[in-house]
Curated annotation (Swiss-Prot):
Protein's name according to its UniProt entry: Glutamyl-tRNA(Gln) amidotransferase subunit A
Ranges annotated as spanning the membrane: none
Entries under Gene3D superfamilies matching the protein: Amidase signature (AS) domain
Family indicated by similarity: Belongs to the amidase family. GatA subfamily.
Gene Ontology CC terms, in alphabetical order: glutamyl-tRNA(Gln) amidotransferase complex
Pfam families cross-referenced by the UniProt entry: Amidase
Gene coding for it: gatA
Lineage: Archaea, Methanobacteriati, Methanobacteriota, Methanomada group, Methanococci
Length: 431
């Protein structure tokens, strides 16, 4: 019975000390489970009875959509985002809203107004961010699967740290309608799951064109493909910036592709040093623009007075860069760099079907450990190129270091999501 499974998860959530959830409405989800059991029309849908957690920056009617900030602490969603409507239409149940870095501004899960999320795979370490609660909820078995958002690695980073699967679809594959955006030209919604097969199913369920999001695209259903004759690229610079212990685990993962019949191709990406400055300059400007609606008049509090340190830092830098005298000096140069980075990245896919490598360059730090902003941003160096270039990218578990999970990142060209998801599934089977 679905209601029994929901009750089991609710009990687990209640007992959990991971702090994965911000808002759970037991009465609401149990009532929805009872209604779902009577709904014969949904019984053959791919997500029938699946219990899904949703990141707190995606609108779900009747739940607190706080973005893990005091700014929106009292804001209750008045509608379902397009992805949530799609989940419900496929027979899924929403169990609650997950914790996250405040306004998705962070890579650790520690900047939330509601307190840090713990990493179920290594309880003394960060789970990664910003989709920290979604990843932790899946890793701690507090739901079947979860939805997160990825602006510069916010699905893939915590998936790697928590030892689960995460997938960032190509830009436009999934509607962003109902997402509280961080940086609209980078943001994409995607799945966090216990295995790669589920990532394929969940991506198919939430993707598709949406009139409410002009960037959204229609794509055929993603199917599993044979990858045995694929050329798999390994970028020297991605490996070079990575901690040796992680690199050793990733090299074992690359051998798995070789054993599957793939040809390994050595590649070079000369723009790796531009990745973080380009990403963050554009991010700051777009985030400053996105936060102007949080003025304390219509709903919530005035963001600059209510937000945490990292969010305020990004707003102030974004405001500074947006001023006319600095726009050309910083922002326009960042846009030019983005164009060059994208051209170079897309060129790599002329030599390879996929690019594989590490997800993060270092292991997650211990909870409460003080890192400078630049040390924190360094977690993103291998994930932001995906968002800058609008390509697709997934993460699967690839070993561990003293019990701390390591994730292998698989990248594909724009709209080659099917290839990446297929490779994730095959890697998992053969690892």
């Amino acid at each position: 019975m679905i209601t029994d499974r929901v009750s089991d998860y609710l009990e687990k959530i209640e007992k959990s000390d991971v702090n994965a959830f911000i808002d759970v409405n037991s009465e609401k989800v149990l009532k929805e489970a009872e209604e779902l059991e009577k709904n014969d029309a949904l019984k053959n849908k791919p997500l029938y009875g699946k219990i899904v957690a949703v990141k707190s920056n995606i609108n779900v009617k009747g739940y607190k959509i706080s973005c893990a900030s005091k700014t929106l602490d009292n804001y209750i969603g008045t509608y379902d985002a397009t992805v949530v409507k799609k989940l419900r239409s496929q027979g899924a149940l929403i169990v609650g809203m997950t914790n996250m870095d405040e306004f998705a501004s962070g890579s650790s899960g520690e900047t939330s107004y509601f307190g840090p999320t713990k990493n179920p795979a290594a309880m003394d370490r960060i789970p990664g961010g910003s989709s920290s609660g979604s990843a932790a909820a899946v890793a701690a078995d507090l739901c079947d699967m979860a939805i997160g958002s990825d602006t510069g690695g916010s699905i893939r980073n915590p998936a790697s740290h928590c030892g689960i699967v995460g997938f960032k679809p190509s830009y436009g594959v999934v509607s962003r309608q109902g997402l509280c955006d961080l940086a609209m030209s980078f943001d994409q919604i995607g799945p966090l799951t216990k295995n790669a097969e589920d990532a394929l199913v969940l991506t198919n369920a939430i993707k598709g064109i949406d009139r409410s999001d002009s960037t959204s695209l229609e794509t055929p259903k993603f199917e599993k493909k044979d990858i045995s004759n694929y050329k798999v690229g390994v970028v020297k610079e991605f490996m070079d910036v990575t901690d040796e212990k992680i690199r050793n685990e990733i090299e074992k993962g690359i051998e798995v592709f070789k054993d599957m019949g793939c040809k390994i191709v050595d590649l070079s990406y000369k723009y790796i040093d531009l990745a973080l400055p380009t990403y963050y300059l554009i991010n700051y400007v777009e985030f400053f623009s996105a936060t102007r609606k949080y003025d304390g008049r219509r709903y919530g509090e005035f963001i600059e007075e209510a937000c945490g340190e990292e969010v305020l830092r990004r707003i102030l830098i974004g405001k500074h860069i947006s001023e006319q005298e600095f726009s050309g000096k910083y922002y326009k140069k960042a846009l030019q760099a983005r164009k060059s980075m994208k051209k170079e990245m897309l060129g790599l896919f002329n030599s390879a079907d996929l690019i594989v490598g590490p997800t993060v360059p270092k292991l997650p730090h211990k909870l409460g450990e003080n890192l400078s902003p630049m040390e924190m941003y360094a977690y993103d160096v291998l994930t932001v190129p995906t968002n800058i270039c609008g390509i697709c990218s997934g993460v699967v578990r690839c070993g561990n270091i003293s019990g701390v999970p390591v994730g292998l990142q698989i990248q594909g060209a724009p709209l080659e999501d099917e290839k990446v998801l297929s490779a994730m599934i095959e890697f998992e089977k053969n690892y």
